[in-house]
């Protein structure tokens, strides 16, 4: 019996050893399979997804802008058939042309033309302005309060005022790029160049000898005249200056521009003061109207009370 028990114990011990031997390699292989799995996983980086999303949004934005531009270009050439097909619309803005009535429509800006289209009671109203004919572009305030307008003056003294512009500054910048023959005369206007470019001024070394020669020639001419002529005034030195075109020093134009820019803030301050005074007057008138209406309402209520008291106090008529 003891031998059998020992035999069973040895067999159990051997079986346990075999089981442990089989389980050990399995446990050693498990982390090896897990590690490469962790290494193969891509890093959780949100920047890649964000960049892909931003690229998609940019592509959508550009595609929308391209479709809108092509759509406006087709509308532009459909409405204004006299404009050549080579003209491409640079900007389209919704605005209103100020006339007897406000004509709401769209302003089409192209490299050589400024075109406005509006429809009133089924009738098309079109305005075509060549860029070359524009002489002045000035920022305009609607009713002297709302800074949402632009005034365009042509060489035929025709003035067009466009108001209700949502982005007046962007339209102004676009017109400044298109109208290359204009220059900024102030912060709020573009005007044509009043002083054309003069020829290069001659050096004083060339002018001074010529002036001396003229003076020398004028002196003997006055001596050779007959005595019958009593008095002949000599040619003044200023006459030599009149022979030459007036040339301003190079810094004079810069000084004039500085003076114009200094005068502009003063006019802005005057306009602001005038606007503030106007607002004060309007506010006082509104207060006066409110007080007068409240006083009239009070008087009406008192009269109603008096009428009610009189009607209750009077005796009722008896039936005969």
Curated annotation (Swiss-Prot):
Biological process, per Gene Ontology: endoplasmic reticulum-plasma membrane tethering; regulation of store-operated calcium entry
SMART domains named among the record's database cross-references: GRAM
Domain GRAM, residue spans: 74-141
Alphabetized UniProt keyword annotations: Cell membrane, Endoplasmic reticulum, Lipid-binding, Membrane, Phosphoprotein, Transmembrane, Transmembrane helix
Molecular function in Gene Ontology: phosphatidylinositol binding; phosphatidylinositol-4,5-bisphosphate binding
Free-text function comment from the UniProt entry: Participates in the organization ofendoplasmic reticulum-plasma membrane contact sites (EPCS) with pleiotropic functions including STIM1 recruitment and calcium homeostasis. Constitutive tether that co-localize with ESYT2/3 tethers at endoplasmic reticulum-plasma membrane contact sites in a phosphatidylinositol lipid-dependent manner. Pre-marks the subset of phosphtidylinositol 4,5-biphosphate (PI(4,5)P2)-enriched EPCS destined for the store operated calcium entry pathway (SOCE).
Region Disordered, residue ranges: 33-56
Compartment(s) of residence: Endoplasmic reticulum membrane; Cell membrane
Membrane topology (UniProt): Single-pass membrane protein; Peripheral membrane protein
Protein name in the entry: GRAM domain-containing protein 2A
Transmembrane segments: 278-298
Post-translational modification: Phosphorylated.
Keyword Membrane: yes
């Amino acid at each position: 019996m003891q031998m059998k028990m020992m035999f069973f114990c040895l067999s159990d011990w051997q079986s346990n050893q075999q089981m442990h031997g089989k389980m050990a390699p399995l446990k050693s292989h498990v982390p090896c399979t897990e590690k490469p799995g962790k290494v193969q996983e891509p890093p959780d980086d949100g920047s890649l997804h964000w960049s892909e999303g931003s690229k998609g949004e940019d592509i959508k934005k550009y595609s929308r802008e391209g479709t809108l531009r092509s759509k406006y270009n087709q509308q532009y050439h459909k409405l204004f058939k006299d404009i050549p097909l080579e003209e491409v619309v640079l900007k389209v803005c919704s605005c209103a042309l100020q006339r007897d009535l406000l004509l709401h429509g769209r302003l089409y800006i192209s490299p050589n033309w400024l075109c406005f289209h509006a429809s009133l009671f089924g009738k098309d109203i079109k305005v075509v302005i060549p860029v070359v004919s524009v002489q002045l572009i000035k920022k305009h305030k609607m009713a002297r309060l709302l800074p949402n307008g632009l005034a365009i003056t042509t060489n035929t003294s025709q003035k067009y005022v466009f108001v209700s512009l949502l982005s007046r500054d962007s339209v102004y910048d676009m017109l400044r790029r298109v109208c290359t023959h204009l220059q900024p005369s102030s912060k709020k206007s573009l005007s044509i160049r009043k002083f054309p470019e003069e020829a290069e001024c001659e050096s004083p070394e060339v002018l001074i000898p010529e002036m001396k020669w003229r003076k020398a020639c004028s002196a003997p001419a006055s001596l050779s005249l007959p005595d019958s002529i009593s008095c002949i005034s000599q040619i003044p030195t200023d006459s030599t200056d009149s022979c030459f075109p007036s040339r301003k020093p190079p810094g004079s134009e810069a000084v004039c521009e500085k003076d114009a820019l200094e005068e502009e803030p003063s006019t802005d301050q005057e306009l602001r003061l005038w606007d503030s005074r106007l607002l004060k007057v309007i506010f006082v008138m509104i207060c006066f109207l409110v007080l007068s209406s409240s006083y009239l309402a009070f008087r009406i209520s008192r009269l109603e009370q008096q009428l009610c008291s009189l009607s209750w106090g009077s005796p009722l008529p008896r039936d005969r």
